Amino acid sequence: MKKYVLGLLIIALTYACNTKQETAQQIIDKAIAKAGGERYKNAEISFDFRKGTYKSERRGGDFKLERIMPDSTGTQYRDVVDNNGFTRFYKDTVVKLSDSMETVYANSVNSVHYFVQLPFGLNDDAVNKKLIGKDTINNKEYYEIKITFDVEGGGEDHEDVYMYWVNTQNYHVDYLAYSFEVNEGGLRFRKAYNPRTIEGIRFVDYENYKTDDLSTPLSELDDLYEARQLELLSKIENKNIEVKLLE
């Protein structure tokens, strides 16, 4: 009898260990590893997005994010965000800007690079992760992970809230949603498509959807997407992607 009870306990403990729920941190770690992992930290990545040409360079803790794009007058500028802040160049000359405009341009440059290199960046110090649960989209199971940001280190958009749907089998981020406060606020839902891997780093494009009902919880946007109740706002396509791994 004792052996029988002991056997049941061992089976129960083994089952409990095998079915132990992963934490949000563990899921994000796996998602980053699947998408490129350590390669992000020492790489040059360039791509074209809409009218701009973008380039990022990371070497350990040092980084530089660039954008070359004409303004409304056709004048071409090079915007740079690095460890020291933001700088705008016209040819090789530094262009003086007000602090408020520097913030606007810096956020714009950073935002494009951020989305292109997702899920890298989700382990930054100011990022808070919470596992909401699991859900199913198009018959595939996903972890739902909510992302918020600390005021300190979270940037000008620290009030934004994100939801990521991470595939429970391959740990790819196939969907994401976010709420934002600028320009009277809004909600967006994105579906990843056209995945490709270049030098071991995974990239995707996005279908970008919206809803005008700003009271909708982020966690319900996937249901609205499946019910075709979201409006396709745009497609976010990154072209001519090149990656150079640095030593």
What are these regions (language model features)?
Residues 47-51, 81, 190, 206-207:
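Extended beta-sheet lipid-handling architectures
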Residues 1-26:
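Bacterial Sec-dependent N-terminal signal peptides
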Residues 17-53:
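N-terminal leader/targeting segments and the immediate start of mature chains
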Residues 40-44, 57-66, 72, 78-87, ...:
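Short, solvent-exposed coil/turn segments at beta-strand boundaries
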Residues 20-26, 88-158, 183, 247:
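Flexible, processing/modification-adjacent segments and terminal tails
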Residues 40, 49, 72, 127-128, ...:
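Short solvent-exposed loop/turn micro-motifs enriched in small/polar/acidic residues
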Residues 52-57, 69-79, 93-98, 152-157, ...:
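Short, surface-exposed beta-strand/loop "edge" segments at domain boundaries and coil↔beta transitions
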Residues 142-241:
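Gly/Pro-enriched, hydrophobic low-complexity segments
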